[in-house]
Amino acid sequence: MSASSSGGSPRFPSCGKNGVTSLTQKKVLRAPCGAPSVTVTKSHKRGMKGDTVNVRRSVRVKTKNPPRCLEITPPSSEKLVSVMRLSDLSTEDDDSGHCKMNRYDKKIDSLMNAVGCLKSEVKMQKGERQMAKRFLEERKEELEEVAHELAETEHENTVLRHNIERMKEEKDYTILQKKHLQQEKECLMSKLVEAEMDGAAAAKQVMALKDTIGKLKTEKQMTCTDINTLARQKELLLQKLSTFEETNRTLRDLLREQHCKEDSERLMEQQGALLKRLAEADSEKARLLLLLQDKDKEVEELLQEIQCEKAQAKTASELSKSMESMRGHLQAQLRSKEAENSRLCMQIKNLERSGNQHKAEVEAIMEQLKELKQKGDRDKESLKKAIRAQKERAEKSEEYAEQLHVQLADKDLYVAEALSTLESWRSRYNQVVKDKGDLELEIIVLNDRVTDLVNQQQTLEEKMREDRDSLVERLHRQTAEYSAFKLENERLKASFAPMEDKLNQAHLEVQQLKASVKNYEGMIDNYKSQVMKTRLEADEVAAQLERCDKENKILKDEMNKEIEAARRQFQSQLADLQQLPDILKITEAKLAECQDQLQGYERKNIDLTAIISDLRSRVRDWQKGSHELTRAGARIPR
């Protein structure tokens, strides 16, 4: 805050981009860091006696410890003001500032709503992660049960292998038995042929015996030859029957042995079929073990992918936290800019009031000038009529009047210089307003970037949610496939072509997931580049604040130079006016006022140093905020 003047021209400080202290009518400003408050009153006084014109401005500084606040009172309407037109000031900036503030409030509300939505989505993601963890634990339990069943089937398979080895040994032994059985079959066939021949002979003998018995029945007389033939046929029949019985007995024995051998052969064939089935079961078991290993690998890959998703969710939450911190920082900047805007509006209103007061004081001074000129003319005429003897004194007074006219011309030049300085300060004020507009545009751009980052985070979360849903669906599918594999393992039926196709599809999906992970890494790199850009912008703002600090120092030096020039000028005027006894009292009063003004300037310098220290502390706070931004950008994982 600056209220210094040189020759009646008001001086305004260049406003920094972090904060601007304003001059308001009876406004209380809290001093930073617990410093005692200071009350500043501004008054402008212009007095003239005869043909002299003097433009002065006094700044009175009073310290008040009890309220500990900075109180600024406006100048009185009876004192001198600087020349400022009301047409130069308008309330359009105030209206536009209020509109922008409303827009910023709406944007902040939308950002708060977006952050609330993000928090709710993060909670939903946490619940989904817990559900996924429970689902994975259930799947792990099922896998453990399947592993236990596989261990039992392996034990059964080992027992079957031992039995198969024994059967193979018995098979080697039965090859010789088969050869022996072949020989026995040939022998049996020959025995069967003999038995058939014996049976045919016995049948013929029985037929012959029947014929002879029939003949005997018809003849009813038996000769010795008939008796002999009957005896012979009977003996032959008995022999044939005995041989037939022997062959039949041997044939039955052979048939019994053959049936036993056939039963043993059937058992061997059944054993061979069982061996084949066991071999097929072993091959199927090996295939199922390979498939189980592949499924275990896929489950591990899915767990790794879930861990990657968790890491991505953590990075997304960290990004949301950094965005919240950035949003808070931007809100603080926005509030500081709003306060700065309100201070500038109050300062403009105070300047309008001071301009009106200055106009009134200028008119009063012009009337005093006219009255003083008329009075001087009357005094001259009275002096010419009353005191003709004092010509030398009159000549001296005329010379002094000429000097006063010269001084009046100098004062007019001084007033013109004050007007030029006022114009320069007005241009600086316009530049400050322009810089403020640039800062507001930068804030709008930063808000747009924040919204873009929020949108990108939402798209990332949607993609992650879709990938997680696809992973859960794949887990369901794989569990269903695993149950199908379990049933096929129990039934020992093989057709694994569709499973191989599904495995190929799973590999393709894994490759697609890897590609999506690469895309996520690229998006994270983009976020890092955006954080670097914001860091560079923060550095630029810090550099602008440093430039503002330098400008404040330059203004302080210029103000000190102007104070010294005013002091010298008033001292020279005092030396000139001491020669005149009539205006001695006026010059003494002016000297006292000049001394008060010098003291006010010195106190103003103290206030300016306090303001500069405040600005430096704000610059440090800004640098701390930029360092926090850099730390937040460094926290983002690569």
Curated annotation (Swiss-Prot):
Keywords: Cell projection, Cilium, Coiled coil, Cytoplasm, Cytoskeleton, Developmental protein, Differentiation, Flagellum, Isopeptide bond, Microtubule, Phosphoprotein, Spermatogenesis, Ubl conjugation. Its main location: cytoplasm. Tyrosine phosphorylated. Phosphorylated on Ser-76 by TSSK4. There is a cross-link at residue 119 (Glycyl lysine isopeptide (Lys-Gly) (interchain with G-Cter in SUMO2)). One of its GO terms (cellular component) is sperm midpiece. It is found in: Cytoplasm, Cytoskeleton, Microtubule organizing center, Centrosome; Cell projection, Cilium; Cytoplasm, Cytoskeleton, Microtubule organizing center, Centrosome, Centriole; Cytoplasm, Cytoskeleton, Spindle pole. Residues 125-198, 226-404, 442-616 form a coiled coil. The modification Phosphothreonine is found at residues 73, 91, 212. The keyword Ligase does not apply. The keyword Cell division does not apply. GO terms for biological process: cell differentiation; regulation of cilium assembly; spermatogenesis. Residues 373-396 are annotated as: Disordered. InterPro entries: Odf2-rel. Seems to be a major component of sperm tail outer dense fibers (ODF). ODFs are filamentous structures located on the outside of the axoneme in the midpiece and principal piece of the mammalian sperm tail and may help to maintain the passive elastic structures and elastic recoil of the sperm tail. May have a modulating influence on sperm motility. Functions as a general scaffold protein that is specifically localized at the distal/subdistal appendages of mother centrioles. Component of the centrosome matrix required for the localization of PLK1 and NIN to the centrosomes. Self-associates. Associates with microtubules and forms a fibrillar structure partially linked to the microtubule network. Interacts via its C-terminus with PLK1. Interacts with ODF1. Localized at the distal/subdistal appendages of mother centrioles. Interacts with MARK4; the interaction is required for localization of ODF2 to centrioles. Interacts with TSSK4. Interacts with AKNA. Interacts with QRICH2. Interacts with CFAP58. Interacts with BBOF1. Interacts with CCDC38. Interacts with CCDC42. Belongs to the ODF2 family. This is Outer dense fiber protein 2. The lineage of its organism: Eukaryota, Metazoa, Chordata, Craniata, Vertebrata.
